[in-house]
Regions:
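Short alpha-helix immediately C-terminal to the canonical SAM-binding loop
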Residues: 60
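A general structural motif
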Residues: 25-29, 47, 161-163, 199
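Long, positively charged, glycine-interspersed low-complexity recognition regions
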Residues: 184-243
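Conserved SAM-binding loop
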Residues: 63
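Conserved SAM-binding motif I beta-strand of class I
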Residues: 49-54
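S-adenosyl-L-methionine
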Residues: 1-34, 38-40, 45
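SAM-dependent nucleic-acid methyltransferase catalytic core
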Residues: 1-14, 24, 57, 69-178, ...
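Anionic group-transfer/hydrolysis microenvironments
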Residues: 33, 56, 171, 207, ...
Length: 243
């Protein structure tokens, strides 16, 4: 199953490769930096407990509305058009106190779908579909998934158990400006510290640079490549594990 949204830094190209690194004996699965949840949707290795988390409140609201109010969300999205004016209107109204959660979810979905590179900031001129035909399948997949909006350290400590598998896809080092939520150099170190103290297991996606390799030099590091979504050519990444 594919994600229902594109996302900056999304793992649609590497999802199967990441899933191939999954162990077979985990009882809880936690996506710490959920984003578009490409790995969650692509995996057929479902755990009894599954958690999706993201710091972006608009994104979390979209996931929750799709899970709990799918039909109402679909009806709301029907009223939106793929146009520059509609995009600007959605941007302006997203933070308005007069909008409902379902309206905000619909507007954020539109902003993701018709923006350039799913950045939600600039209108993408290429025609994009606002079809919601896959929403019912997504709703069913999310039935057993807990949806959280927590700081990554708080989340990891809350769900950490020996039988837990954490998938972490943080904002990449030196590319943090592309993400809506602030992520600092100190946060990269903070993530490293909490993963070093983990009782469970983790799989971590990162860009391949010297800073990352030095930070995680004590763990298993595998180099991979994917096509760059925002420019031509390939992008070097690493998959890091503690098992």
């Amino acid at each position: 199953m594919r994600s229902f949204i594109p996302w900056i830094g999304g793992k649609s190209q590497l999802a199967k490769r990441i899933i191939s690194e999954f162990p077979t004996d985990f009882e809880r699965y936690i996506e710490v930096f959920g984003g578009g949840a490409s790995v969650l949707f692509a995996s057929d290795k479902h755990a009894p407990m599954e958690v999706y988390n993201d710091a972006n409140g608009q994104l979390v609201n979209l996931f929750r509305c799709l899970k709990y109010h799918r039909e109402e969300l679909q009806k709301e999205i029907r009223y939106y058009l793929n146009s520059r004016e509609m995009f600007a209107d959605c941007q302006n109204r997203l933070e308005s106190s007069g909008t409902t959660d379902i309206q905000r979810a619909a507007m954020y979905y539109v902003c993701i779908k018709i923006s350039f590179g799913a950045d939600t900031d600039s209108f993408g001129c290429a025609p994009k579909s606002l079809d919601t035909g896959r929403f019912e399948d997504i709703e069913k997949r999310l039935e057993r998934v807990l949806i959280e909006q927590k700081d990554f350290e708080e989340l990891i400590k809350q769900y950490d158990r020996p039988n837990a598998l954490f998938y972490c896809d943080p904002p990449y080092h030196t590319t943090e400006k592309h993400y809506s939520e602030r992520f600092t150099e100190a946060d990269h170190h903070r993530l490293n510290a909490v993963l070093k103290a983990l009782k469970g297991r983790f799989i971590l996606s990162y860009n391949d640079d010297d800073f990352v390799r030095e930070l995680y030099k004590d763990f298993d590091i595998k180099a991979v490549e994917r096509q760059n979504n925002l420019s031509k050519g390939s992008f070097k990444e690493v998959i890091i594990k503690n098992f």
